[in-house]
Amino acid sequence: MLKVLFTAAESAPFYKTGGLGDVTYALPKAIKKQGVDIRVAIPFYEKKFPAKYLPKVKDLTHFTLEMDGRPVYVGLKTIKLGDVTYYLIDNRQYFDRDGLYGYWDDGGRFGYFQMAVIEMLQVIEWIPDVIHANDWHTAFIPVLLKEKYGWIKPYQQIKTQLTIHNLQFQGWFPPSTLATVFGIGREGFNDDGFGQDGSINWLKGGINYADLVSTVSPSYAKEIQTPAFGEHLDGTLRKQSGKLVGILNGIDSEVYNPATDQNLAYNYDAKNLAGKAKDKKALQDEMHLPKRTDPLFAMVSRLTRQKGADLLVDALENFLVQNNVQVVVLGTGDQDLEEDLSSLQDRFPGQLAVRIDFDEGLAQRIYAGADYFMMPSAFEPSGLAQMMAMRYGTLPIVHETGGLRDSVLAYNAETGAGDGFSFWDYNAGVLTNILRMAKSVYADQPKVYAKLQQHAMVKDFDWHHSAAEYLKGYQRILGKA
C-alpha cells in the first residue's frame, strides 16, 4: 500500500486561518478513499485546540532533536478523525501561543516543526513513500531530506511533493538560521537552491528540491510563471516547469450540502428550491434587511485588496444608488476597508448589511440565502467559496483569474451556457457593469437565471476528483505512473 505523510501548519477542524486548513482536512480524507495509507502531521497549538477533541488525543511518545547544539523536546500526540491518523507535534515554547503565525521566531518555530516531522518517522517506525509538504511552513522538508538527513538510509527513498497554496508567502529568513536552526552548511545557499537576495527562501528551496511541485489550479500554475503573478519566483518556476502541475481544489460535498446542512433554517436541493427562497428571507431577518424580492448579492471573504474588497467598495456606491438590490458582506481584514464598508452601510440602510466578523455558520446561511456571490479577487490561486456558493445554488460573479477562471463558466447569452458571471479587466467600472448584468438577468429573465442556477448546483467539485490527480502525481514521482 502506498504510504504518504501529508504535513502542514494547520488543519480543520482543529484550527484554520484560510483555505490551507480546509485542504489539510479534506484532501487526505479523499486520498485515503483511493486506497492510500495517508497520515497527517501538524503542530499542536494547545491554546487553539478545540476542547471537544481533546479527550480523543493520545500521548504517543516523546524524543529530542538538536537545535543550535542543544537538545529540544518533541512531544508526539495522535488523534484519529474518521479513517485518517493525525500526528500532533507538541512543544509549548513554540506552539502554546494565542495565534498560529506572525511571531518574531517563526523561523525557529517552523524549522523545529519540519525537523520534528522528519525525525518522528524513525521513532514511530513508519517511513512513507512520499512526504507531501504544503506552503512555506513545511517547504524546507525536501531540502532537509537531502542536506541534513541524506545520510540516513530509510530517508533516501522518500520522494517529496510541495503544494503552493499562495505564492505570496514564502518564508524568508537570515542565512544564520542554516546553522542555528537546521545545523546545515551553505552548499544549497545559491540561486539554484534556497538562496534569494542574500536571504534563505524556504519556498524557493522547496520548489528546487521537491520531486514534484503542484499548485491549486491549472490557471494559477501558468500565472505564477509570469512576472505579474510570480512574486519574484517566476524565473525559478519557469526553470522547474517540467515538474509543476496545477490541480484544482475541491470542496467536501458532505459538509457543504444544502439538503443536510444544519446551519440552515430550511434545507433544499436542486430538484426543490422552495427552501432556498425561505433561507433568503431568514438571512434578510438575520442581517436586519427588509424582506424584498430584489436580488441579494453577497461576499464572504477576508476584506483585503487581494480579495478585491477595495474594488467592491469602489463599485458598490454607484451600484446601490442606481439599482434596487441588497448586498450582504461578511468578513474581517484591513481596517481601512472594514471602515469603508461600514461607512457605506450607514449610507445605504436597508440595502447594505456588513458584518465585520467571521462566523462559519452565518457564512453557510449566506451561501444559501443569497442570489449572487461576489468574488472579485485580484488573484486567486484556487478559491473555495465560489464552489460552495454554486453548491448552494448561488451564482458566482468572479474576476477571471486562477482557480476562479477554472471553476466558473461565464454566462453566454447566445448559447445559454454558463454557471456564473465573470469579468476580465480589473477595475470598478467593469465590476459595476457585470453586477448590473447579473441583476438584469435575475429581475428580467427568471427562466435564464433558473437554468444557470441548475448548472451551478449540479457541477461536481467533490474532492475525489482532486484526490485522483494527486494520486497520479505520487505515482509519477515513484516511477509507477
From Swiss-Prot:
Could you tell me the EC number(s) of this protein?
2.4.1.21
Q: In which pathway does it act?
A: Glycan biosynthesis; glycogen biosynthesis
Q: What is this protein called?
A: Glycogen synthase
State the family it belongs to.
Belongs to the glycosyltransferase 1 family. Bacterial/plant glycogen synthase subfamily.
Q: Which residues form a coiled coil?
A: none
Note the Gene3D superfamilies from the entry: Glycogen Phosphorylase B
The primary gene name is glgA
The record's annotation in InterPro entries points to: Glyco_trans_1, GS/SS, Starch_synth_cat_dom
